[in-house]
Curated annotation (Swiss-Prot):
Highly expressed in spleen and peripheral blood leukocytes that contain mostly T- and B-lymphocytes. Expressed specifically in resting T- and B-lymphocytes and expression significantly decreases during B- or T-lymphocyte activation. Expressed at lower levels in thymus, ovary, colon and small intestine. Phosphorylated at very low levels in resting splenocytes. Rapidly and transiently phosphorylated in response to splenocyte activation. This is GTPase IMAP family member 4. Keywords: Coiled coil, Cytoplasm, GTP-binding, Nucleotide-binding, Phosphoprotein. One of its GO terms (cellular component) is intracellular membrane-bounded organelle. It comes from Homo sapiens (Human).
Amino acid sequence: MAAQYGSMSFNPSTPGASYGPGRQEPRNSQLRIVLVGKTGAGKSATGNSILGRKVFHSGTAAKSITKKCEKRSSSWKETELVVVDTPGIFDTEVPNAETSKEIIRCILLTSPGPHALLLVVPLGRYTEEEHKATEKILKMFGERARSFMILIFTRKDDLGDTNLHDYLREAPEDIQDLMDIFGDRYCALNNKATGAEQEAQRAQLLGLIQRVVRENKEGCYTNRMYQRAEEEIQKQTQAMQELHRVELEREKARIREEYEEKIRKLEDKVEQEKRKKQMEKKLAEQEAHYAVRQQRARTEVESKDGILELIMTALQIASFILLRLFAED
């Protein structure tokens, strides 16, 4: 990320910044995927193809249908696929402040970092605006994110009988330049496909993503901003878990007081034992309920009002520190 909020990037060049494979904990059973590209490139439809069902709203429109970063998930081979669809924040006319806010939202939704960054480009006429948006994306993520990036060509169905490799050999120079950057890390999709064709291309893409993950030693893309955001999320999660612990102890004390008062008033030993068992059952139910809440504390934190502002504040503080570092160099 750049040092200043409002012109933020994923490409900090500060001394000591950490890039490349990051720890997958606490989400080591997840495969986190981010879709980026210009408005109308087919990001939402690609997300639906990856997840195997229609969960993102997609369609043909001059303006972005997706208004802010959205996260959806599904299961695949005992792995949770987490896909984040981004709006047209990388379009050249979008203000940097708006881009920055959605980048922070993307960080929140994919922390501690994505395993794959999918650059979505439609096949066909590659306009100057599309080229500029692509350049903005590549610059924003930086050279060191390239090993996590995959090029996705949408509208494969527009090729008709033309072979993809034949098309790419005759493609415009800008597309050829992209191919030089991504090498064999590319895939073409027909997002209108159904049945066997849909499953086959889904398996091909997920296989490519798995290959990228292996090549990056099972790690995820990270940088100082992701690390700072993850620290804030974990801090808030621990605070939430402590709150749940206090609530549980308070509720258990209330239950004990209620039942012990009733037990004291009983003279029948059998009735006393019956009430004790009822109390123990009630306590066990509360412990089970709060155990689930503890496990879901992170999700609760990520979805609560105000967390985006907390992350923004944390990253702005980090940005201030980075600015000081630049000034001292």
